[in-house]
């Protein structure tokens, strides 16, 4: 079977879930200059064709720097923000205007060169962001550098209803006709909050948020952001993370940080369960709970490969339906990714831990330990004093968690009589 068939099958729930949702996408000026920009535009057009309501916010920092250099002007910053005097503002207007036209042209060209040729795509922009001056901070006058005062929610919503892609530039206008240079991260965050967007997608140079060891942080909540911001300091990753957290605090369900340098990063993040970047959300990513009859299909999908390998004892659908109350599961976005069962042993104060399984894609997140802890807690609540486990392949894992080698003679009679000598499982026990 071709890989794309399997991918499409797995992506179909997300295609349905994203339809008619509002996504605000922020692409910095570095991303527009990157060779992968064309692929990003193609992916945005694809999202639009799938029914996603798109607001694209672009940055322009390197383009402004280039204009300043061409005119022999020196850029000035304070606290990481550009000081926009009159001469700099001319460069900002020039750079932003040219960039906006280039993006509109690229969006138009992309659909003409794609399989969706002939379909109508409108890009809309305008005076949709009202701004105010930052003013004087710590004795420094920021001149024409501003901050977002208001986003025209009704105007943008109307354009989205008309199936336009809304393009917002890092410029804002005051009621008195002044123009202000804005941070694209601020524009994107405020737009996402005021529009009640379903997602804020932030492009950066890295795959997402990287920890101190350079490893990708896949998920975190806004409350977990502060230590990372302190570590990152003025690094651009910190700006993206701060924007992502701010959007979530403002009511945006999910913020994502992905790489503009990686082809397909946006689609991977949106249409695969594991994603490819960093997700910031107030939502609970996973839940550990008792299984219900509706979980039988998911359990079969999880344990069948392990049964075929001889790691787990085979259980039919009928057996699972009959014994479903014995199971605890870890659910992630509607998918059962881990399970374990507790079987009290008749005429004894012992129980058996069975069918502990974790989806291969999620085996390094401590989910096995979480389920073991839950099973042990359930066993104590039931008044059991000993927990047995029979295994053929994971003896060391259980020994590392306090289980000691045992034997058939130690099993309660009701369980010993069912022992499969042909399978020859190793027996371990743990006092509770």
From Swiss-Prot:
Q: Pathway, according to UniProt?
A: Amino-acid biosynthesis; L-arginine biosynthesis; N(2)-acetyl-L-ornithine from L-glutamate: step 1/4
Domain of life the protein comes from: Bacteria
Domain N-acetyltransferase residue range list? 286-432
> What keyword terms does UniProt attach to this protein?
Acyltransferase, Amino-acid biosynthesis, Arginine biosynthesis, Cytoplasm, Transferase
What are the recorded GO MF terms, alphabetically? Answer: L-glutamate N-acetyltransferase activity
Record-listed E.C. numbers:
2.3.1.1
**Which Pfam families does the UniProt entry name for this protein?**
AA_kinase, Acetyltransf_1
**Is Acyltransferase tagged as a keyword?**
yes
Quick check: keyword Iron-sulfur in the entry?
no
Broad EC category = transferase
- What reaction does this enzyme carry out catalytically? L-glutamate + acetyl-CoA = N-acetyl-L-glutamate + CoA + H(+)
Q: Which PROSITE patterns match?
A: GNAT (PS51186)
Q: Which GO terms describe its biological process?
A: L-arginine biosynthetic process
Family, per the entry? Belongs to the acetyltransferase family. ArgA subfamily.
Q: Which NCBIfam families match?
A: N-Ac-Glu-synth (TIGR01890), PRK05279.1 (NF003641)
Kindly provide the name given to this protein in its UniProt entry: Amino-acid acetyltransferase
> Mind giving the lineage of the organism this protein is from?
Bacteria, Pseudomonadati, Pseudomonadota, Gammaproteobacteria, Pseudomonadales
Which gene is this protein's source? argA
């Amino acid at each position: 079977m071709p890989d794309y068939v399997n991918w499409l099958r797995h992506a179909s729930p997300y295609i349905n879930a994203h339809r008619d949702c509002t996504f605000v996408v922020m692409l910095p000026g570095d991303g527009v200059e990157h060779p992968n920009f064309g692929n990003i535009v193609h992916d945005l057009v694809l999202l639009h064709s799938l029914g996603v309501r798109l607001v694209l916010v672009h940055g322009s920092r390197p383009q402004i720097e280039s204009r300043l250099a061409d005119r022999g002007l020196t850029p000035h910053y304070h606290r990481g923000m550009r000081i926009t005097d009159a001469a700099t503002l001319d460069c900002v207007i020039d750079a932003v205007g040219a960039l906006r036209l280039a993006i509109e042209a690229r969006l138009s060209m992309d659909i003409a060169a794609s399989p969706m040729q002939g379909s109508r795509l409108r890009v809309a922009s305008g005076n949709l962001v009202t701004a105010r001056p930052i003013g004087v901070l710590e004795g420094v006058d920021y001149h024409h550098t501003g901050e977002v005062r208001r986003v025209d929610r009704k105007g943008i919503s109307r354009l989205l209803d008309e199936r336009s892609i809304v393009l917002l530039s890092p410029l804002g206008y005051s009621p008195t006709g002044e123009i202000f240079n804005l941070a694209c991260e601020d524009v994107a965050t405020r737009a996402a909050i005021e529009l009640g967007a379903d997602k804020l997608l932030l492009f950066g140079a890295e795959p997402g948020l990287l920890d101190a060891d350079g490893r990708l942080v896949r998920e975190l909540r806004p409350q977990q952001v502060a230590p990372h911001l302190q570590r990152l300091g003025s690094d651009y990753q910190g700006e993206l993370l701060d924007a992502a957290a701010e959007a979530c605090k403002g009511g945006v369900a999910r913020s994502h940080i992905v790489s503009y340098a990686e082809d397909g990063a946006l689609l991977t993040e949106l249409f695969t369960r594991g994603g490819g970047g960093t997700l910031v959300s107030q939502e609970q990513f996973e839940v550990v709970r008792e299984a219900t009859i509706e979980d039988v299909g998911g359990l079969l999908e999880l344990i069948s490969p392990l049964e075929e390998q001889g790691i787990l004892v085979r259980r039919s659908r009928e057996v699972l339906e009959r014994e479903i109350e014995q199971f605890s599961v870890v659910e992630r976005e509607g998918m059962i990714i881990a399970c374990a069962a507790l079987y009290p042993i008749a005429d004894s104060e012992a129980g058996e831990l069975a069918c502990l399984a974790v989806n291969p894609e999620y085996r390094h997140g401590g989910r096995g330990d979480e389920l073991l802890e839950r099973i042990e807690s359930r066993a104590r609540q039931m008044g059991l004093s000993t927990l047995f486990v029979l295994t053929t392949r994971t003896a060391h894992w259980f020994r590392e968690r306090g289980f000691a080698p045992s034997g058939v003679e130690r099993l309660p009679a009701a369980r010993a009589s069912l022992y499969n000598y042909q399978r020859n499982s190793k027996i371990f026990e743990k006092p509770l």
